[in-house]
Regions:
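Long, charged amphipathic helices and adjacent flexible linkers at domain junctions
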Residues: 103-115
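Short, compositionally biased low-complexity segments
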Residues: 32, 100-101
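Long, highly charged, low-complexity intrinsically disordered interaction regions
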Residues: 2-81
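Short alpha-helical linear motifs
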Residues: 65-66, 79-82, 97, 112-115
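Alpha-helix termini
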Residues: 48, 96-98, 110
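Structured, non-catalytic alpha/beta "coupling" segments that mediate domain-domain communication
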Residues: 88, 93-99
């Protein structure tokens, strides 16, 4: 198993903050400081033998360029990404469905107020 490297950044208060994985970065700095790859790695949760979650997330973003590029892809297409299996794909699909429902609710509320 690869040793996690400690990473450092300065938070909004000017304090030095360290973490070893994307979840630690999110907790210590906030989600807005995380890259798309780091957020996706958090959703993926764990890696596969020889491939950490961060690397799997990088491969997904490389394949689809962005979250927007991933949105309407059939679930079957994600199986071609090394390290992605059913549970990880289900987590990603669930996260995208949650985001879609949030957007739909915001649009619905906005349209309701404008009429």
């Amino acid at each position: 198993m690869a040793k996690e490297i400690e990473k450092t950044a300065i938070n909004k208060e000017g304090e030095r903050v360290t973490w070893r994985h994307p979840g630690g970065k999110l907790l210590r700095l906030g989600p807005e400081y995380c890259t798309d790859e780091e957020l996706l790695a958090i959703i993926i949760s764990s890696g596969s033998p020889g491939m950490p979650a961060e690397k799997i997330a990088e491969e997904i973003i490389k394949e689809y360029q962005s979250f927007k590029g991933m949105v309407n892809q059939p679930i079957e297409k994600f199986y071609k990404i090394k390290g992605l299996k059913q549970v990880k794909i289900i987590r990603i699909a669930a996260a995208f469905e949650i985001a879609r429902r949030i957007v739909n609710q915001i649009v619905k509320e906005k349209n309701g107020k404008n009429t």
